[in-house]
UniProtKB/Swiss-Prot annotation:
Residues with site note (Important for catalytic activity): D311
Protein name as annotated: DNA-(apurinic or apyrimidinic site) endonuclease
Phenotype of null mutants: No visible phenotype. Ape1l ape2 double mutants are embryo lethal. Ape1l arp double mutants have no visible phenotype. Zdp ape1l double mutants are embryo lethal and cause DNA hypermethylation and down-regulation of imprinted genes in the endosperm.
Recorded family membership: Belongs to the DNA repair enzymes AP/exoA family.
Cofactor note: Probably binds two magnesium ions per subunit.
PANTHER family per UniProt: AP ENDONUCLEASE, DNA-(APURINIC OR APYRIMIDINIC SITE) ENDONUCLEASE
Gene (name only): APE1L
Subcellular location: Nucleus; Nucleus, Nucleolus
Site residues by UniProt (Interaction with DNA substrate): H343
InterPro entries in UniProt: AP_endonuc_1, Endo/exonu/phosph_ase_sf, Endo/exonuclease/phosphatase
Active site: residue positions: Y182, D222
UniProt lineage: Eukaryota, Viridiplantae, Streptophyta, Embryophyta, Tracheophyta
Tissue specificity: Expressed in leaves, flower buds and developing siliques. Not detected in roots.
Length: 364
């Protein structure tokens, strides 16, 4: 789950040394939104499932703005924007624009626009990929001094096409690509919008990774899967979870969505085939019960205290040695640092590449 005030810039930061320009879009050659070549590249990233971006702006914007100001990310990836795409009833949708077709939607668009024009967000260019209704959707905020060369909104890298429900934003920089996804939930049953949808998604992700191996990748977002037992607070609870007593016929599909053996196995195979590194687990080998999970259940009810790590930064092996830090910024079962969402922000910081390393990454 989105520009014109003077930005707040940290002393000695790249943005402070070089003025940030507006992200002027220009039509490319039919394969995405292409931007001017920029020799500086982002190195600080943040991903967050906002669980309704509008609600976060209305209720939690001050604390989230402070978090962004303090960390000063170059790129912010948002999932579960939950704002509808522009286009009236029965008309083609513009999935890159917020809808203003009704009085309520116009007011909501104005709220988001004002929020994203205020410090520190006025320093970022914003790209949206929105669903037809207030469901799912993603956003990508990139500092204006780090303009991507191209931006796509699908796994097939086709101009103007958006994934159903706005689940993908792919930004191409000079030496790497950044993929922001809101991966579909597995659901509880072998139905078209549950198990089948997730299997198809996982298959397409592998195909995407195989087609784009010419350049290192940073894949972030809500990937809706916990890879290992260490990635959940209560493995037995999640492994035996049921919906209204229903048990899938295949034991590989049993358990909490995001923690079934089938999903976990496919996720592990995807990481291996894509030659990816889980940045957080690369640095944090042991389970951290206070701050090692990105999603937390409702503090009231059976999911109280039940937590999962389902938000990730996966990076190509070529980038492994540049990982400086990868942190989850929520703590405890009371959702401290979650900024109103049921997910907390996750951040990644890379060291600056040497000239030789940059050349090798592009050539490999």
């Amino acid at each position: 789950m989105k520009r014109f005030f003077k930005p707040i810039e940290k002393e000695n930061s790249p943005a402070a040394k070089k003025p940030c320009l507006s992200p002027e879009k220009r039509d490319g050659d039919g394969d995405g939104v292409e931007e001017e070549k920029n020799q500086n590249e982002p190195s600080k990233f943040m991903t967050w499932n906002a669980n309704s971006f509008l609600l976060r702006v209305k209720n939690d914007w001050s604390q989230f703005s402070k978090f962004v100001s303090d960390f000063d990310p170059d790129v912010i990836a948002i999932q579960e924007v939950r704002m509808p795409a522009a286009g009236g009833k029965g008309k083609p949708k513009n999935h890159e624009e917020l809808s203003d077709d009704t009085k309520v939607l116009r007011e909501e668009k104005q709220i988001l626009t004002r929020a994203l024009s205020s410090p520190p967000f006025g320093n970022y260019g914003v790209w949206w990929s929105l669903a037809d209704s207030k469901y799912a959707g993603t956003a990508l905020l990139v500092k204006k001094c780090f303009k991507p060369r191209k931006v796509y909104f699908n796994l097939d890298k086709l101009a103007s096409k958006h994934e159903p429900d706005g689940r993908v934003i792919l930004a191409e920089f000079e030496t790497f690509r950044l993929l922001n996804t809101y991966s579909p939930n597995n659901g509880w049953k072998d139905e078209e919008n549950a198990f089948q949808r997730r299997r198809k998604w996982d298959k397409r992700i592998v195909e995407f990774l195989n087609k784009t191996s010419d350049k290192p990748l940073i894949w972030c977002g809500d990937l809706n899967v916990s890879h290992e037992e260490i990635d959940v607070s209560h493995p037995e609870f999640f492994a035996t979870a049921k919906l209204n007593g229903y048990v899938p016929p295949n034991k590989e599909d049993c358990g909490q969505p995001g923690f079934t053996p089938s999903e976990r196995g496919r996720f592990g195979a995807t990481i291996k085939e894509g030659r990816l590194v889980d940045a957080y687990r690369y640095l944090h080998k042991e389970q951290e019960m206070e701050s090692g999970f990105s999603w937390s259940g409702n503090p009231i009810g059976k999911y109280r205290g039940k937590r999962m790590r389902i938000d990730y930064f996966l990076v190509s092996e070529q980038l492994k040695d540049r990982i400086v830090s990868c942190k989850m910024h929520g703590r405890g079962i009371e959702l401290e640092g979650f900024h109103g969402s049921d997910h907390c922000p996750v951040t990644l910081e890379l060291s600056k590449p040497s000239s030789e390393m940059e050349q090798n990454q592009v050539s490999n």
